[in-house]
């Protein structure tokens, strides 16, 4: 439970707005105030939830909303958030009133929506409801955030545009909610008002000034919603507003479609087809108009709003500077892109809402049937007319005009002849006699031209309440060919009609004509004929249908009600008995909300209830989904005879609790049912002290809470009621009686001896609560009873503290008149005088100071005096009174805040002048060094700035200010310096113009540099274009340096376009691009790169922009420079320490950067000034993952060996040469050794990857394997470890070259070359040279991603190796063995081991 202390703090600003004693607040006023603690929305949410929880509540009448509200209010109160919080704001009666109001509105809306839709409107209604739910869900989520966005946007250009969006959205939401709960007739009148809301919302898509479309397109066209950098806060806020406005725009369309659909359906049901046509036409026009605005017309120059917004979203999403995945913007953008694409797809997929063509009425009418009048509606002398409507799948046209009237003379049921529709649409036929309500009489399918108007008359005959007449007409019409399977009202057939009218003769005949499926045929709401019969009390029909084997437990679609539910709520005992005769019946079947037929029987009365209770299998205590039993409902309905009937079963649990642990007694107390409460209390088994969960509220608590004094008084007098029971938080009935101002209850409590010093868990006594309630008269009553006026809460507050801090003047004065201690302090060291100052209680402050003037300057623990607190809360009269009483005008609290600072910050010029006149210290500053002048500047109060500048005798801005010395460490800076800096930093352009333009302070603070630093383009433009300041400024570091470093792209663009030097020194040899790189501003880097940056320029550390990007871990910038500016940079360049980019990347443990550099071919062999390669550094630093990567991915094993062996390098000791000499291979050793160097001229770039030594060694391995010769001869057994290492290294390198020839990165990643090298070395060292071939083949075999073409290429490379090397001194036998080896290698490794075979399969 939230603490009272927290509530007091949160509620303070709301409380001071409350009216003084004696003035009652309206429900709306209370709701507004309480909403500041987010109570109002909570109540609305609860009210909305109940519609789902209790939508089938079997309680009828006007009290339905009240009962449901009471139930949900009980739930809310039980949540433990009651009590003190509501007491503070006087909101204790708001939940019940507001929930009741909201519920009544929601029930009205549901009643309207439960009306059926014509076939023409069903699909439209589904589309609208589906789309509204998608759009409104996210729009509501954005709503609260949009308020915050509105408040924070100060930009002069953007703010008015956003305000238009906000104003329209608020108006739309307000009007939508206002009409939502209207009753049907009022709802219709509101929608049909001339120049009303429908017209206004239709015009929202026009480019008029007060429309919604205009500001949305203005944002898009001006580019306000596209951020220029990640710090472009304004653009992100405008983007949010654009998205919110666009969703509102879509919501408006669907709202209009919903309303026009409703109106069309309403008049269709009424039979006013002309009005139906009018709104049906409006429906289509609205859709087509909005569709054009939203998705365009398909031409390139007519893009819709959704396309334009999606373009904005994609532009933002594709901005590389955003770093989207790191700041959560990406998720939001994707969500909106998906939403708008979904909406667009939905709208585009619907070409139109209606068929555009209105049918011509070509009907020729003739009476061919021998059916004489009178029959049904056919009476001689009446005039009959017909109208038609096209229907094609889910689209319908308007209804045609009525045909000329035809007089009825002796014959009925004419034949209508019409031309066949060429587009093969169905034709609906309507009929009207005289001026009566039209009826749908049938449907003509394609290819048919004749229609006999007889089926509707059959349906009407079955509906006739006069059974004899109905049966006679039905028999005649059926004999003459009427269709018993034709459907009419809401999908009902003659079976439903006979079931409703109770015409058992017709139903009996139909049961022989129909199939079993037709007897179970549901209408559009899921009602089968037996549902209709049970709901109408036609027991005979029910019995007949049961005998014919219909489904007895079938359920309706929405509420899932069985026929037994319907009979029970109607009280039809005989029908109930017939239903119970079925062996299949389930008497305890539940509906959607878990209510059983017995729950419904509560509404049906005592007789039906008795019939239920006589059933052995009945569950008397069955609970709904929310835990309500039938006994709960009987009490809620205040029907004691029904409750008594239940009790007569001797099975009822009278203490049963619902999901919130609320009993029937609780509900009686909540609803104020005194007589019912008496009956319950007198029951022997009653537990009067059951408490709700988790609120722990008893029935007595609820009776007091809802101000039912008679019920509360009765309960308190009852011996089995605990009057001292504590609810959550330690709240007793006595506390609630004070909270609610129940004097009668308090008097009774005093009479029965209740302890008046009862304390809540936070030690609030009744007197504490009275002191901060709206019932100050209770204070004297409690004091007269001896209440302790010096009692303290856990926070040390006395009743007087609470009265003053809650703005309760009358309560405070009553306590003061009783000589309470006015010098008591609470836990914050505050006295009542502090509270009076905070809440502006002048009369209380005067009363206290008249008693003790010394408290005027008393400080609390925060060093706040009463004067300072009054100033912080802008209570002018109190401030002036304190100053007149000698209060220290320059008082400062622990943060350094003083009265002058408070009013300067708020922009109150009159009070600033007043304090100047009272000789306040104008140079006083807070702990951050901020004086009144800085506050005025930072908050844009130009009037105060000008006033201060005019008071030369009191304030001089040229004075040195040491309070902010840390901001100006190298010199003594004046107030003027900080003021100009602040004006620029906080984007106060009018004040900048005053300082620079009017006063001529061009040099102070370097305004152009500061404007560039903070990205204020308007100020930059003003200074350059109107004050003619140089774009390069007068300092060493230029404005461009500042703008680039801080990523202000638009400012960078502007400065460069106006001649700023992109290579100007920014200090330490750095230029603008270096500054941008250090902060990872890719977009700025790209722009500067395109405008003449010198990429070879080095800073004082010898670092180029490229090396800076690597050092700063700016991965995307580094890749951009390598990929796009390769001609301007040297990937292998070195700084003053001879470090390359790879060295730097290793230093910073940036594996991603290392991979990037390796990918683009950086030389891994380069050594820095300390003779270290990048791999050496990684090994020394023990960066194991980097070491592993460099070993396996760099592919330079010879260099690895050299690094490992230092001065014993193979190249230095010439051991490779010695090794090859022993093989009798002649070569130009130095050239071979240098073949890996960039400076080598021996090989072209294409051939430079071929290591001749490695090739020879690999071939030698293969030759000796297949010729069964030893690899190392006996003479070489003593060969040094270095020679063996060299051989293994070269073989592995050549093997890597073979793999590289595939250009298959995945294949290379699957081979661990370090492992290959180790195995080859081990084999050579141990003399197991035959294993080398197996090692290499095994490595190839481990590659899972090799494709057949890769294998063929691999084989080709191996087989072509002979031609790539020269063996001048090799013997013929060796050459022959070499050729045979290549063949055997292909056969044994690529084929025999199955590698190639497997890959080709």
Swiss-Prot record:
One GO cellular component term: host cell presynaptic membrane
Region feature Helix H8 is the probable transmembrane region of the tetrameric pore inserted in the target cell membrane, mapped onto this chain: 238-257
UniProt xrefs under PROSITE patterns: ANK_REP_REGION, ANK_REPEAT
Localisation: Secreted; Target cell membrane
Molecular-function GO terms, alphabetical: toxin activity
Outcome recorded upon mutating residue 34 to S: Loss of function
Intervals holding ANK repeats: 458-489, 490-521, 525-554, 559-589, 593-622, 626-656, 660-690, 695-723, 729-758, 762-791, 795-824, 828-857, 862-891, 895-924, 928-957, 971-1003, 1004-1033, 1035-1064, 1068-1097, 1101-1131, 1137-1166, 1170-1199
Any single GO BP term: exocytosis
Residue span(s) of the pro-peptide: 1200-1401
Expression (tissue specificity): Expressed in venom gland, cephalothorax, and abdomen tissues from both males and females.
Keywords: ANK repeat, Cleavage on pair of basic residues, Disulfide bond, Exocytosis, G-protein coupled receptor impairing toxin, Membrane, Neurotoxin, Presynaptic neurotoxin, Repeat, Secreted, Signal, Target cell membrane, Target membrane, Toxin, Transmembrane
InterPro entries with a match to the protein in the record: Ankyrin_rpt, Ankyrin_rpt-contain_sf
Region named Furin-like endopeptidase recognition region: 17-20, 1196-1199
Subunit structure: Homotetramer in membranes.
Note: Is the main neurotoxin responsible for the human envenomation syndrome known as latrodectism that results from bites by Latrodectus species. Anti-alpha-LTX monoclonal antibody 4C4.1 blocks neurotransmitter release induced by this protein by preventing tetramerization and ionophore activity once inserted into cell membranes. However, 4C4.1 is incapable of reversing pore formation.
Function per UniProt: Presynaptic neurotoxin that causes massive release of neurotransmitters from vertebrate (but not invertebrate) nerve terminals and endocrine cells via a complex mechanism involving activation of receptor(s) and toxin insertion into the plasma membrane with subsequent pore formation. Binds to neurexin-1-alpha (NRXN1) in a calcium dependent manner, adhesion G protein-coupled receptor L1 (ADGRL1, also termed latrophilin-1 and calcium-independent receptor of latrotoxin (CIRL)), and receptor-type tyrosine-protein phosphatase S (PTPRS), also termed PTP sigma.
Name used for this protein in its record: Alpha-latrotoxin-Lt1a
Organism from which the protein derives: Latrodectus tredecimguttatus (Mediterranean black widow spider)
